[in-house]
């Protein structure tokens, strides 16, 4: 691509699709001197979406994080609804070791509509948000999970495990869901279920409508209580915060749908087996030289 474009490159290039591709190719090929020359010759203030991304990445390569912040802010002024550029702004702020309260201020300005629905750029943004406001990241992930439990299971568990050591008290902000406030763990006919109580949802294996007979019954029960539901007896085991329920269900789904190429394992430990039983399971899996996720 580089050799094809160079013979027809004007002395004063302007932003265009072909220049976007050329600049990206120079960056990918690590031809930074040529890239710098191109960007210098194009110093006319008319940058495309893709060219701004190249400039930001070039600033990161040079460890010029202040410049990366400036360019990211410029990009957001043009493309304020871009998850990609909000992620770039957070990335640059973290790289520059900006004070936490200033980063949290940036996070507070992210338009909520751009993370209302799942997108891959939105997911990348969410992982960066989690570094300064884990509660916000978790609340968004839970909403995405409600929309698509199976499709979001891996992403939700990854977010959880990536932030196990993160201090959830970095902010005092609370982001309650408008449609889900709790989750139930209950047994029925010898099987244990974990379900989110979600307003106006179609009840499924993972979600339960509070206006359904079972939803109303569980809402009125105390932990440990048993009640008749049709021909069956149900027992309420736990009432969980919604986000905890979403993580637990995600763990179960990810384990169930694992086709064998996901280095993820869910260990079920019987109380009677104790620590010895747990160690035997860990030893069996560790011999396969794969990553283990210990879930309790």
Specify the residue positions occupied by each region the protein language model found.
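Alpha-helical repeat scaffolds
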Residues: 1-10, 31-44, 65-77, 99-112, ...
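Generic helix N-cap/helix-start motif at coil->alpha-helix transitions
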Residues: 11-20, 44-53, 78-87, 114-122, ...
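Structural register within alpha-helical repeat arrays
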Residues: 21-22, 54-58, 88-91, 123-128
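Hydrophobic/aromatic side-chain positions at a characteristic register within alpha-helices
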Residues: 27, 60, 94-95, 129
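Extended boundary segments
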Residues: 149-193
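Short, well-ordered loop/turn sites that connect or cap secondary structure elements
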Residues: 177, 218-221, 227
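Short, structured beta-strand/loop micro-motifs enriched in basic residues and often containing a Trp
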Residues: 202-215
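Glycine- and charge-enriched low-complexity intrinsically disordered segments
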Residues: 226-231, 251-296
């Amino acid at each position: 691509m580089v050799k094809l474009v160079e013979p027809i490159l004007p002395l004063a290039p302007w932003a265009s699709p072909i220049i976007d591709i050329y600049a990206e190719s120079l960056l990918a090929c690590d031809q930074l001197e040529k890239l710098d020359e191109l960007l210098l010759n194009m110093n006319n203030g008319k940058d495309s979406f893709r060219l701004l991304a190249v400039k930001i990445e070039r600033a990161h390569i040079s460890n010029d994080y202040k410049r990366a912040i400036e360019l990211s802010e410029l990009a957001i002024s043009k493309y304020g609804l871009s998850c990609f550029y909000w992620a770039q702004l957070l990335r640059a702020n973290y790289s520059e070791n900006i004070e936490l309260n200033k980063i949290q201020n940036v996070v507070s300005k992210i338009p909520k509509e751009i993370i209302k629905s799942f997108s891959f750029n939105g997911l990348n943004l969410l992982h960066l948000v989690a570094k300064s406001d884990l509660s916000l990241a978790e609340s968004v992930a839970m909403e995405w999970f409600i929309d698509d439990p199976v499709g979001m299971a891996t992403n939700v568990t990854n977010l959880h495990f990536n932030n196990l050591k993160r201090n959830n008290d970095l902010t005092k902000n609370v982001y309650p869901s408008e449609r889900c406030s709790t989750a139930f763990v209950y047994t029925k006919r010898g099987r244990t279920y974990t379900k989110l109580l979600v307003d106006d949802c179609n009840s499924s294996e993972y979600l339960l409508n509070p206006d359904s007979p079972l939803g109303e019954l569980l809402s009125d029960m105390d932990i440990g209580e048993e009640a008749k539901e049709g021909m069956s007896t149900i027992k309420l085991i736990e009432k969980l915060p919604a986000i905890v329920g979403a993580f637990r269900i995600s763990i179960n789904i990810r384990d169930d749908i694992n086709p064998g190429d996901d280095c993820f394992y869910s260990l079920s430990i019987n109380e009677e087996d104790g620590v010895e039983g747990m160690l035997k399971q860990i030893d069996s899996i560790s011999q396969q030289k794969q990553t283990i996720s210990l879930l309790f």
